[in-house]
Swiss-Prot record:
PROSITE patterns: BIOTINYL_LIPOYL, LIPOYL, PSBD
Compartment annotation: Mitochondrion matrix
Family statement drawn from the similarity comment of this UniProt entry: Belongs to the 2-oxoacid dehydrogenase family.
Domain Lipoyl-binding: 35-110
GO BP field: aerobic respiration; pyruvate decarboxylation to acetyl-CoA
Domain Peripheral subunit-binding (PSBD): from-to ranges: 168-206
Region (Disordered) residue spans: 123-161
Modified residues (N6-lipoyllysine): K76
Biased composition annotated in UniProt, kind: Basic and acidic residues: 136-157
The protein's name in its UniProt record: Probable pyruvate dehydrogenase protein X component, mitochondrial
Keywords assigned: Lipoyl, Mitochondrion, Transit peptide
Organism: Schizosaccharomyces pombe (strain 972 / ATCC 24843)
């Protein structure tokens, strides 16, 4: 029996009576057949009254927990009122558009399982504030001064033009209504937007200001609602149509005359191939490396020592990655990754200078956009001019030397030595110090090939 009694008490306490129930009961069975009052909720700590703008349910509609029952407008915002339990909206006591104090009965709600036909509706008892307001019948007679009849006529005609009257009051208007105890504030002519009653309308009604002031302000505001652009003319352009092609052609000519900035920085070194010729001749007898393998090995060794393949990252991108905390990717170098390739155009030629000069050098993929490596041949001629000057000097001193005729008549062909000129072009991403180290190392490799091939 005790267990059954506790179960019934819990069931009774869980019934739908949490929405502003005026009186609570404690029974051993569920309370059915009795509806409860739904009062105006306080949506903020400082809220004293509010306006009902919309009911989302009609009388007799059932609602569930979490549904929006109505919308309440306060002096700060318009907020939705949600229900906590399931139920039925039995009756709406106050429709929308009325200024209602907090705690006043606005509707009657019933349990979701109740039958509205057999339901006993509670009587709407007036609150203490309403009773005190209705009991005081003393009215403060406003001090009305004589005004011009013209302003009164304009004020009445303006109020008649407002077809859609907004019955919700602003806090300042509600304060004046309670201060001067105006019983029927809707009879006051409203000059606000959409028929809203303003503070000036109430002050004009009680005689604090001229009755024609609200109507004159209303006309002034309505004149500013629609902007008149009839007297506005578009601004004329500062240039004519004939001058536009001239400006375009002048700009094109200026672009043509401005020289393009060279993006590459060039380094040159002169290379002698005498030792390389003799080395290749010995290697050919032993059936060892060919020209392609030897030149590729020397270029790869210079790349590895100078670390030219380490492309510097973009300063802006690296700074952005540093701000985001992302790791900065650095390219690593190794001999296997940077082994270049030599692609000759003519494999049958026996001229070493021409063979290397006309060959294409395939650099690694990460250097192809930043580095250009070329070889060009330069012919140097050496004659006997120095030796001839020495002979003239001997003749002037009277030293023992060959006769002048024998010196002049002796004719020797000038000797020619052909060297290679190494040209390296780099962009800003490549370090200049590494580029200088590369060309110097490559020059040393060509002029001392035995030292390089001993490590390969």
């Amino acid at each position: 029996m005790l267990k059954h009694y506790i179960h019934q008490c819990v069931k009774a306490s869980s019934c739908k009576h949490s929405l502003s129930v005026k009186q609570r009961y404690f029974h051993c069975s569920a309370l059915n057949g009795v509806a409860s009052m739904f009062r105006m909720p306080a949506l903020s700590p400082t809220m004293e009254e509010g306006n009902i703008t919309k009911w989302h349910f009609k009388e007799g509609d059932s609602f569930k927990s979490g549904d929006i029952l109505l919308e309440v407008e306060t002096d700060k915002a318009t907020m939705d009122v949600e229900v906590q339990d399931n139920g039925i909206l039995a009756k709406v006591l106050i429709e929308k558009g009325s200024n209602i104090p907090v705690g006043k009965n606005i509707a009657i709600v019933a349990d979701a399982e109740d039958n509205l036909k057999d339901l006993e509706l509670p009587k709407d008892e007036a609150s203490s504030e309403e009773q005190s307001f209705s009991s005081s019948k003393e009215e403060v007679k406003p001090i009305v001064q004589d005004r011009e009849t013209k302003s009164n006529v304009e004020h009445k005609s303006t109020s008649q033009a407002n077809d859609a009257v907004n019955k919700s009051f602003l806090p300042s208007v509600s304060y004046l209504i309670h201060q001067y105890k105006i019983e029927n504030p809707w009879s006051i002519p409203a000059t606000g937007p959409h028929g809203r009653l303003l503070k000036g309308d109430v002050l004009a009604h009680v005689g604090k200001i001229d009755k024609g002031v609200p109507s004159s302000l209303q006309k002034f505001v309505r004149n500013l609602e629609v902007l008149d652009f009839s007297g506005v003319e578009p601004k004329k352009p500062s240039y004519t149509e004939d001058s536009v092609p001239v400006r375009k052609s002048t700009m094109i000519e200026t672009l043509k005359t401005v020289p393009m900035k060279d993006e590459y920085i060039t380094f040159e070194r002169s290379i002698s191939l005498e030792k390389l010729k003799s080395l290749l001749a010995k290697r050919k007898e032993k059936d060892a490396f060919g020209i392609d393998e030897v030149v590729s090995a020397m270029i790869g060794d210079a790349l590895s020592i100078s670390e030219l393949s380490k492309v510097e990252p973009n300063s802006i991108e690296s700074a952005y990655d540093l701000l985001l905390g992302a790791p900065i990717v650095k390219l690593k170098s190794s001999v296997s990754n940077f082994q270049p390739k030599l692609f000759p155009k003519n494999n049958n030629t026996k001229d070493l200078h021409k063979y290397i000069r006309d060959s294409m050098i395939g650099l690694p993929s990460n250097l192809s956009d930043y580095v250009k490596l070329n070889f060009s041949s330069v012919t140097k001629s050496s004659s006997n001019n120095v030796e001839f000057l020495d002979d003239v000097y001997d003749m002037l001193l009277g030293s023992n030397s060959d006769s002048i005729d024998s010196r002049i008549n002796r004719h020797e062909e000038p000797s020619t030595t052909e060297d290679l000129t190494l040209t390296l072009s780099i962009k800003d991403n490549i370090s200049k110090s590494r580029a200088i180290k590369f060309v110097d190392c490559l020059k040393s490799n060509f002029e001392n090939p035995e030292f390089v091939l001993s490590r390969w």
